[in-house]
Design a protein with these regions (language model features):
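Flexible, acidic loop-helix segments that line cofactor/substrate-binding pockets
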Residues: 1-17
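Flexible, glycine-rich terminal cap/loop adjacent to redox cofactors
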Residues: 13-142
Length: 142
């Protein structure tokens, strides 16, 4: 089968590690490709905290309004291993919704991928329902 060079990952084994697959923001800008950015900070990620490596981030570029992954950059502890789930998803045309739906073992570094996907989902919640939900939960708690 043909090699899809858009999904060939790379990693730099520094401290912290840097791993990437697909487009970076700079690539997308240079190619005039529209994108949205979702960023998940690893500062409060349980496994990273347990290992004393709670620094770094996962940055995911997606098509505007869609969960299609255009590129991922991970800076952090074992980034070269953590990125493989995104490589698999991009290779098989799966988006962030699929990653969000996967049950991950707790606490693992790979679980951060799910948190990044969930961050994407939470940024796209329908805002029109929030005032109603706030009133409902205020009533429910009283």
């Amino acid at each position: 089968s043909k090699v899809n060079y858009n999904v060939v990952p790379w990693a730099t084994f520094t401290d912290p590690e840097v791993a990437r697959v697909g487009l970076s923001e700079q690539d997308a800008k240079e190619q005039n490709i529209a994108y949205e950015v979702t960023r998940y900070q690893l500062d409060h990620h349980d496994r990273s905290l347990t290992d004393g490596e709670a620094h770094g981030f996962i940055k995911v570029l997606t098509q505007p309004g869609k969960d299609k992954i255009l590129g991922v950059t991970i800076v952090g502890y074992h980034a070269g291993e953590v990125i493989t789930e995104f490589v698999f998803a991009m290779t098989h045309g799966m988006g962030l919704k699929k990653i969000s739906a996967v049950t991950h073992i707790y606490p693992t570094l790979g679980e951060a991928n799910k948190f990044a996907a969930n961050a994407w989902r939470s940024e796209r919640l329908p805002q029109k329902y929030f005032p109603w939900l706030e009133r409902f939960f205020a009533w429910y708690r009283s």
